[in-house]
Design a protein with these regions (language model features):
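ALDH superfamily catalytic-core signature
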Residues: 231-360, 365-389, 452
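Residue-level signal for inorganic ion chemistry
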Residues: 31, 68, 90, 112, ...
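Glycine-rich loop-to-alpha-helix module at the N-terminal edge of alpha/beta enzyme cores
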Residues: 32-122, 132
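A short acidic/small-residue loop/turn micro-motif
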Residues: 16-17, 22-23, 38-43, 263
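Conserved C-terminal structural/oligomerization subdomain of aldehyde/semialdehyde dehydrogenase
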Residues: 30-36, 221, 258, 312, ...
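Hydrophobic face of amphipathic alpha-helices that form TPR/SEL1-like repeat modules
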Residues: 1-29, 55
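Rossmann-like NAD(P) dinucleotide-binding subdomain of oxidoreductase/dehydrogenase enzymes
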Residues: 123-267, 409
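Short, well-ordered beta-strand elements within core beta-sheets of diverse protein domains
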Residues: 34-40, 57-61, 147, 257-260, ...
Length: 494
């Protein structure tokens, strides 16, 4: 792979960090140094915000909607032209299976297309008021948006935040996770090549705490859009409250997967493993708590475990691979801590939970070549835990790894209490062929995104976000664009 992005992207050009600091990136599939990238400082963050403010005042905020749409459509086209390059970059950077990486780059391009088309439909309204006259509303851009994105879906989430913010007439300072900055840097470069003016989209790789705090507290930043852990989201809210800065937060999850006996439970059992193990479980929407009606529990578990054992875990560069490594050694260690606690509690493991390595170009069961090096990579077998005590950490806390807990239920009302006792409320699935039950349970589950007889969580056209400690505000759909605008009311007397 040639010419990896290695610097900050500010004012339409790459430049070194002011301190010349650099960070090392590790390929999680090989445990080898992949590349180095510049690490921004708070001073770099301040400079990027001030540059973005100048770009906003200098013309982006007032650019004709049709011209803004033209640029966003152009960004979508250039992203599709570079899809394979970006997918390979993501695969090497975070161990994302190459087929998933391609899908995610395509999703990012689709997001830009959607918001390019939305620009001409984003407007206020006229309002009849009691005293007569003319009353109407305007949707106006906010200014500089700080977008802080995670390492698990770095490219699509960067697009989820940048595209609607740009479409609404804002400028964006994008802070990718320190583990996964490369596709974000290319996004900035390609967007500029597609016609986005200098300073409208800045990209700052670097340490999350220092750069994030600098962005959140900068007086010119009008809104912070963050996806990541609940703990960091709480910290951002505290900082933003000092000057009443707007925030939107997409945080943790402990999503339920509810399977009733009248459902097509065989299909649910076949498809449910990937609803929790996809992306090696590093997904805030992972259906990590499975509730199965007791009459089908044993048969469901048998089929679920069989489907789990068939998953292809291995080298993410291979087309057939479904699950790659965890993103880092520390992330694997964190997941293993949960599994160790479960073992100490006497939890039953139906399968998985062990560490293994994968030789280059090999699969899960491949042997290293004769005389070769030991297997490498931050791999962990998908773990299926049964009859889990609801007081354990594995049941209560977000693991962010390939671990699922399955329990039986007898009573719908008690099951719903167990579902909703979680402090999280992001996503979930309900499996039943009874439409009345499906709608009743969907209304009762305290989650922002639910699917019935499906595991789908994300649609570009629909709002995405959670209840409770899973966050506030919404990504995607027209709701996201509204969240990047100010609503102004104007009254004209007769």
């Amino acid at each position: 792979m040639n010419s990896l992005p290695a610097q900050l992207f500010v004012d339409g050009t790459f430049r070194d960090a002011s301190t010349r600091a650099r960070a090392t990136l590790i390929n999680p599939a090989t445990e080898e140094v992949f590349t180095e990238v510049a690490a921004a400082s708070p001073a770099d963050a301040h400079a990027a915000v001030e540059s973005a403010q100048r770009a906003w005042e200098g013309g982006w905020r007032n650019l004709a909607p049709g011209k803004r749409a033209e640029i966003l459509f152009s960004i979508a086209r250039i992203l599709r032209e570079h899809l394979e390059e970006l997918a390979q970059l993501e695969c090497a950077n975070i161990g994302k299976p190459i087929s998933d990486a391609r899908d995610e780059i395509g999703l990012g391009a689709r997001v830009f297309e959607y918001y390019a088309g939305a620009i001409g439909k984003f407007c206020g309204q006229t309002i009849p008021v009691a005293r007569g006259g003319l009353d109407f509303t305007l949707r106006e851009p906010m200014g500089v948006i700080a977008a802080i994105v995670p390492w698990n879906f770095p490219f699509p989430i960067a697009c989820w935040k940048a595209a609607p913010a740009l479409a609404a007439g804002n400028c964006v300072v994008l802070k990718p996770a320190s583990l996964s900055p490369l596709t974000a840097l290319r996004l900035g470069e390609l967007a500029h090549a597609a016609g986005l003016p200098p300073g409208v989209l800045q990209v700052l790789p670097g340490p999350g705490s220092a750069i994030g705090d600098a962005l959140v507290t900068h007086p010119l930043v009008r809104k912070v859009s963050f996806t990541g852990s609940t703990e960091i989201g709480q910290h951002i809210m505290e900082l933003a409250a000092r000057d009443l800065k707007r925030v939107s937060l997409e945080l943790g999850g402990k999503s339920p997967n509810i399977v009733f006996a009248d459902a097509d439970w065989q299909r649910a059992a076949d498809t449910s493993p990937m609803s929790v193990f996809a992306n090696t479980g590093q997904d805030c929407c992972a259906r990590s708590r499975v509730f199965v009606e007791r009459g089908i529990y044993e048969a469901f578990v048998e089929k679920f475990v069989a489907a789990t054992r068939k998953l292809i875990v291995g080298d993410p560069t291979q087309e057939a691979t479904q699950l790659g490594p965890l993103v880092s050694a520390s992330q694997r260690a964190s997941v293993e801590d949960f599994l160790d606690d479960a073992r100490k509690q006497g939890t039953k493991f139906a399968c998985g939970g062990n560490r293994f390595g994968v030789p280059p170009s090999g699969g899960r069961d491949a042997e290293p070549p004769e005389g070769g090096t030991p297997n490498k990579g931050f791999y962990l077998e998908p773990a299926v835990l049964l009859d889990v005590d609801k007081s354990t950490r594995c049941w209560r806390e977000e693991i962010f790894g390939p671990v699922v807990c399955i329990v039986p239920f007898d009573d719908e009302a008690q099951m719903l209490r167990d579902v909703n006792v979680s402090p999280y409320g992001l996503s979930g699935s309900i499996w039943t062929n009874n439409i009345s039950r499906a709608l009743r349970v969907a209304r009762a589950v305290q989650s922002g995104v639910l699917s019935i007889n499906s595991h789908s969580s994300v649609h570009v056209e629909a709002p995405f976000g959670g209840y409770k400690q899973s966050g506030l505000g919404r990504d995607l759909g027209m709701a996201a664009m509204e969240g990047y605008s100010e609503l102004k009311n104007i009254y004209v007397a007769e």
